[in-house]
Amino acid sequence: MTLSQNRCTLIGNRRSAHDEEVVQTSMTQTPEHHAFDVITMGRVGVDIYPQQAGVPLEEVETFSKSVGGSATNVAIAASRYEHRTAVVTRTGNDPFGRYVVKELERLGVSTKFIASVDGLNTPVTFCEIFPPDDFPLYFYRAPKAPDLMISVKSLDLAAIEQTKVFWTTVTGLSEEPSRQAHHVAYQARARRPLTILDLDYRPMFWSSPEVATREVGRALEHVTVAVGNREECEIAVGETDPHRAADALLERGVELAIVKQGPRGVLAKTADETIEVPAHLVTVINGLGSGDGFGGALCHGLIEGWPLERVLRFANAAGGIVATRFECSTAMPTSAEVEAVLEEALHV
């Protein structure tokens, strides 16, 4: 397949909102040789997940702590395939924010575009684990998540333009100033190949479905790849049937439309190809990170220029591996792990 090519505090190498205007000149002159393979933009937080399955939160005895947030998880997943990755986001000026930075550095993700916001807390997310398909999430993002404070003037538009993959999620469109920052970033990309929108719609982050549909529609005018499940496609283009949804996304101008269908697998369409790949069947422990694992592997396959069917099989397998593990970000597989699973599937 070929796709047409507030006052804040500085922590580590994170930029603060107070300093953003001062450093803007240097931030918009990222040298080509420093370009990233993947830049994601959007949610970050700390996942506090149970270490017992089938138990409600009030009865859980032990928890694990890991970095979370869909856009951040995708950057982590892509870094597992030895790509140069970075995430554009914001944390609180608090211990969890400092943890996020240290953990991302440990996991090989650049924190160059992360700043902390005074007066707001780093988001925390709890979940319950009831395999195979019930994983209630409890988001603590009030009064406002720092990652929704990304501003236009803070963006390194040169880096965003130069990166091979620019990945965003629709949550970043839910509130200002993040909403406008995302639209400016899309305009800077100017429909460059591999400008990807994850249709990751979460109703609790939006004032109404109608507002979400409007903002996603604006974004679709600028992206070249759209990825979502049937429910997310309904918000984006008013269709739940996978084929009609993919066609509607293509009509909006994207070059590659991917519709995830859960146990029925995944459908992908371009102007010239229609590919359906069955689900990679696993014993699910926690399915919450599988979509982000799919996303990071999708970035990898597209960067490598693989045929579309191989990209989808690899991404499906990666997502399946994540679903067999308790956590999300630290559950992302390596290329060798994914290839081993694919090889094993050939002999089943």
State where each predicted segment sits.
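A short, aliphatic-rich alpha-helical micro-motif
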Residues: 33, 159-161, 217-220
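Conserved phosphate-binding/catalytic region of the ribokinase-like
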Residues: 7, 19-39, 187, 238-348
